[in-house]
């Protein structure tokens, strides 16, 4: 389900936008069918998932302007549960400074993965050209 390019995007970018809630910067790949994020300060996200466990997440490389759209069903693992404790070390290693505040881990069983890209690729722009363009844009924004 998750191919090498999608895995690399998640592992490099970490920031995934869950539809109708808020961006989560703690995503990890658990296996080829599961991704997950740490719930640190997301009561709205947890409430929304409680009402509807189906979610979509977008991961986009800001410079390449490419990414992945994933759809799946969530499972909330609460701190103290055996399932939480089993996978928690991934976040303790990734963001040790925040790990004490992680209240839950939200696992998404991925059922669909689609690539995303910006329209200039349709016109023949290369990744190298997109990266150069956005490096220049960001350099102007943040000199």
Where do the model's predicted regions map?
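N-terminal structural module
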Residues: 1-37
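Sterically constrained small-residue positions within well-ordered secondary structures
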Residues: 9, 28, 48, 61-63, ...
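Short hydrophobic-aromatic micro-motifs
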Residues: 35-38, 106-108
């Amino acid at each position: 389900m998750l191919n090498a390019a999608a895995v690399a995007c998640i592992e490099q970018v970490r920031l995934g936008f869950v539809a109708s809630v808020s961006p989560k910067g703690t995503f990890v790949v658990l296996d080829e069918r599961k991704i997950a994020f740490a719930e640190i300060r997301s009561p709205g996200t947890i409430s929304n998932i409680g009402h509807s466990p189906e979610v979509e997440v977008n991961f986009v490389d800001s410079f390449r302007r490419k990414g992945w759209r994933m759809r799946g069903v969530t499972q909330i693992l609460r701190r103290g549960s055996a399932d939480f404790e089993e996978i928690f070390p991934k976040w303790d290693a990734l963001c040790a400074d925040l790990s004490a505040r992680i209240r839950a881990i939200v696992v998404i069983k991925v059922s669909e993965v689609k690539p995303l890209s910006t329209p200039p690729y349709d016109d023949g722009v290369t990744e190298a050209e997109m990266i150069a363009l956005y490096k220049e844009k960001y350099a102007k924004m943040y000199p």
